[in-house]
């Protein structure tokens, strides 16, 4: 059985070391990625004071939210959003969508938000590793698309950027993708959230300025 307290304490220790090396004033938030976890495991981490959880699929988000509705949890949608799932996602009112990966998707979401009279907080996903397997806008177009969404999608509240580190064992390449995203983030007025870093690379992400981490296997793997 997982020792939940031991796991989260080990994570926080690593985060604190990386955070204070970057800046004593830097604040880092953890989103526990619970896509393969049971509601019981989430409950255990809630008992350890973890509040934000993320899911990859809308249906899984719905299931977990309903089974844990008695807890004051903050839910994030971190996986790619299919257009036919927009209504379902909006009905769940997540705290944040991390994976807004195109202007086209933004316009589709905006249209549904307007009809339903709701807003959605989101991050623009940047494919800073230039990998075909990853979603997101290319860095060269990111600022222009961010601006377009901000101006044309009044119900979509952009809060910053998200990226997934390069899929490689070469730490320099991973760092490069994080630095690329951080440089873009620094050019966006009023951007507050930089979602970078997962279980294998969160310390490097913090060193590059991440303030929101998406941690799955570190917390939930046996």
Curated annotation (Swiss-Prot):
CDD domains to which the protein is assigned, alphabetical: PLPDE_III_YBL036c_like (cd00635)
What is the protein named?
A: Pyridoxal phosphate homeostasis protein
Q: Which residues carry this modification: N6-(pyridoxal phosphate)lysine?
A: 35
A cellular component annotation (GO) from this entry: cytoplasm
| Sorted UniProt keywords | Pyridoxal phosphate
Q: Known Gene3D superfamilies for this protein?
A: Alanine racemase
- Superkingdom assignment: Bacteria
Biological role stated in the UniProt entry: Pyridoxal 5'-phosphate (PLP)-binding protein, which is involved in PLP homeostasis.
The record's annotation in InterPro entries points to: Ala_racemase_N, PLP-binding_barrel, PyrdxlP_homeostasis
Q: Which GO terms describe its molecular function?
A: pyridoxal phosphate binding
Pfam families linked:
Ala_racemase_N
Q: Which family does it belong to?
A: Belongs to the pyridoxal phosphate-binding protein YggS/PROSC family.
């Amino acid at each position: 059985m997982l020792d939940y307290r031991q796991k989260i304490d080990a994570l926080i220790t690593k985060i604190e070391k990386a955070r204070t090396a970057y800046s004593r004033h830097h604040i880092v938030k953890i989103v526990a990625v619970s896509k393969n976890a049971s509601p019981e495991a989430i409950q255990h981490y809630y008992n350890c004071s973890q509040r934000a959880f993320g899911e990859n699929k809308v249906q899984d988000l719905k299931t977990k939210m309903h089974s844990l509705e008695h807890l004051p949890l903050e839910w994030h949608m971190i996986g790619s959003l299919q257009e036919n799932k927009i209504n379902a996602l909006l009905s769940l009112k997540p705290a944040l969508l991390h994976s807004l990966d195109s202007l086209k998707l933004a316009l589709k979401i905006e249209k549904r938000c307007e009809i339903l009279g709701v807003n959605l907080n989101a991050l623009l996903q940047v494919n800073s590793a230039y990998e075909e397997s990853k979603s997101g806008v290319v860095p060269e177009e990111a600022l222009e698309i961010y601006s377009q969404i901000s101006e044309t999608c009044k119900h979509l509240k952009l809060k910053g950027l998200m990226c997934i580190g390069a899929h490689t064992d070469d730490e320099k390449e991973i760092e490069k993708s994080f630095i690329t995203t951080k440089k873009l983030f620094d050019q966006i007025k009023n951007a507050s959230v930089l979602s970078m870093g997962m279980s294998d690379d969160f310390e490097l992400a913090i060193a590059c300025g991440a303030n929101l981490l998406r941690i799955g296997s570190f917390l939930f793997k046996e």
